[in-house]
Amino acid sequence: AQSFKAKGFTLALVGGPVRDALLGRLGNDLDFTTNALPQESKKILNEWAENVWDTGIAFGTVAGKRGDTTVEVTTFRTEHYDANSRKPTVEYGKDINGDLSRRDFTVNAMALELTTDKPEFIDPFNGLQDLAEKTLRTPGLPNDSFNDDPLRMMRAARFASQLDFEIEPAVLNSIKELAHRISIISAERVRDEFTKILMSSNPRKGITLLVDTGLADLVLPEIPKLRLEVDEHHHHKDVYEHSITVLEQAIEHEDRLGGPNLVI
């Protein structure tokens, strides 16, 4: 932060790392936002990091690694989306509030300004209150957010699973309404989010959300179809419920005895 400040730039910790720090679970992957242009951020990172890469520079992002710590520094930006793609047209923004407004959920739209005399907590969308209430809500209108980037609907189910949060009713209704938009997302991106749901502490919650919102009908139709399958031994209400229970038992077994993170 001091290197950015010395060159007249601002730097703020932002997004997931702020959320996780408030939850007492800050990791080694840190995201920052700045008013410095990517080329300037790269120069500063080159002075600090052991390795620097700029594969995301077209979107304003430069990354670096030092020891076990990985950082991504992204220039303030605004985004405009084509209706048939989740890849945005990026324009550099003027302030951090505009940058935070593009985030997926309010709990990910908080920042900690590090180049002021004292660290300043920035929370224009009441993310701290939503964090305390364990609620997923969008900074703006949910329809706008999910139309812009339909993958955020999968992320809602993932965060609900990982953090044991509830999705605000208006957000949940928007997901049901716009579930069909998930079709523009690549299979690889969908797979990654679904894997994170499976690896979460409460996969039942995320999978149930995918089924109840209609997302599963489009990305993994085999799952909701299990509800139509009858357990021939009548030990369970349906094959879906049985499958979820087996998954939970497998996770409990792995947590108790240790084992691979994921085998499919």
Predicted regions and their residues:
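Catalytic cores of the polymerase beta-like nucleotidyltransferase superfamily
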Residues: 1-264
